[in-house]
């Protein structure tokens, strides 16, 4: 207000502005919830996490790791290729690929939620910061705060990976890539009015009739 040349303002005007914006007075103003945070940043908020799949190779049974990124508003997922050694360098490489894939979008990522795994190193954060993406580390023992990514991991396992024996890295990468494509392009999501994540069309308005207009014909 001062920049507009308004030097004095009465208490009632302040009160009216707060009421118009649904802002409670300071003594009763509550802190925002995690759900409030997700909604406020929904268009540009992503989250990531790891999951594993046991595969069969010439060396025997091998656990392979995959990094998944999810856009929390649309539920779109981007998955990495698998690796036996998910070190910090590999995580940075996959993160760079994720940023390159999304940075030209209308709503490019600005915040990335991640867990407390040591593979999310200082170099990982610097890589994102250099691309204009802020990291938000989750509190200790709070997987429920990353529930949407955890739910996708459960979905890909129960609907796809648990039904296959993956013979090697290439086979696993193929399975994950194909399921991610199906998930993004065709699988309905209840939180999106049963539309897949990449379906941006508006929900049609169904025509309704009054009960008195229902006619029974024998």
Set out the residue ranges of the language-model regions.
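Charged DNA-binding/catalytic regions of mobile-element recombinases
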Residues: 1-218
């Amino acid at each position: 207000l001062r920049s507009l040349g308004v030097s004095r303002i009465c208490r009632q005007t302040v009160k009216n502005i707060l009421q118009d914006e649904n802002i409670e007075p300071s003594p009763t103003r509550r802190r925002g919830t995690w759900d409030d945070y997700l909604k406020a940043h929904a268009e540009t908020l992503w989250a990531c996490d790891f999951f594993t799949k046991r595969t069969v190779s010439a060396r025997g049974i091998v656990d392979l790791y995959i990094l998944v990124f999810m856009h929390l508003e649309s539920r779109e997922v981007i998955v990495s290729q698998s690796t036996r050694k998910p070190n910090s360098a590999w995580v940075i490489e996959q993160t760079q690929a994720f940023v390159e894939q999304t940075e030209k979008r209308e709503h490019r990522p600005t915040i990335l939620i991640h867990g407390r795994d040591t593979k999310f190193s200082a170099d990982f954060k610097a890589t994102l910061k250099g691309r204009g993406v802020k990291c938000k580390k989750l509190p200790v023992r709070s997987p429920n705060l990353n529930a949407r990514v955890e739910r996708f991991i459960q979905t890909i396992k129960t609907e796809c990976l648990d039904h296959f024996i993956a013979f090697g890295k290439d086979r696993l990468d193929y399975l994950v890539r194909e399921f991610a494509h199906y998930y993004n392009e065709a699988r309905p999501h209840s939180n999106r009015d049963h539309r897949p994540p990449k379906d941006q069309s508006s929900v049609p308005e169904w025509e309704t009739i009054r009960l008195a207009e229902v006619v029974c014909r024998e």
